[in-house]
Amino acid sequence: MSLQFSVLASGSTGNAFYLETEDHAFLVDAGLSGKAMDGLMAQIGRKLDDVDGIFVTHEHSDHIKGLGVVARKYKLPIYANEKTWKAMENQIGKIDTDQKFVFPMETVKSFGGLDVESFGVSHDAAEPMFYVFHYSGRKLALMTDTGYVSDRMKGIIRSANVFVFESNHDVGMLQMGRYPWSIKRRILSDVGHVSNEDAALAMTDVIGDETSRIYLAHLSQDNNMKELARMSVQQTLASKGFVTGETFDLYDTDPKKATPLCAV
């Protein structure tokens, strides 16, 4: 038995993740149009009507843009905490009552042999949370959209086999870039986004003996580059004794191209 997943899209313009077991298939977020979501699923040889439900992280548009359309078209259950439901209801349109499920923060829901654990992050949304998936002794941890990584968060995601980890910006590029200071300050704040270097430092506290893959996610298209993010993370990890390519590898994500479906 295996848990498989793909980062369908990740970046400032839209985010969506897919995972499946032998018995179930789920999305985490649907931050692109319904048409784009169809196309991304086709890239990995899957269809949206194969999906059993959608877990929502928070109400920002780059995570829920296509949520209402996809859920209505395919009659999919949506799982989100109460504050996120209240914050996003006007954005996603009418959802039938029997498709609306409350998934409280810091709880676990089970779907067959798949255990889904929610945990809070630090972001400027109503009640943002991400997820850890446990299946057949394997662990997949998703965590983006957080201004910092607390010890509590580290304890929850520690020793995952696969991480999807925010590596949003290069601080120098952000500071010298075109954004107004108010937006720069928000991104750099404790409720903003994690930089390349801070992401790598957090990784050094959570990488385990069985960690095999780390996906660098939610890269800013204005304040980061794939090559820069990878180099910065590799250098910071190496300075702490973690050598990429020995026991684990780093992988890029893209706002328009899904990563290959792979086993956790």
Swiss-Prot record:
A divalent metal cation 2 binds at residues 62-63, 145. The gene is yycJ. Binds 2 metal ions per subunit. The endogenous metal is unknown. Its EC number is 3.1.11.-. This is Exodeoxyribonuclease YycJ. It comes from Bacillus subtilis (strain 168). One of its GO terms (molecular function) is metal ion binding. 5'->3' double-stranded DNA exonuclease. May play a role in mutation mismatch repair (MMR). Required for accurate coordination of cell division with DNA replication. May play a role in cell wall metabolism. It comes from the Bacteria.
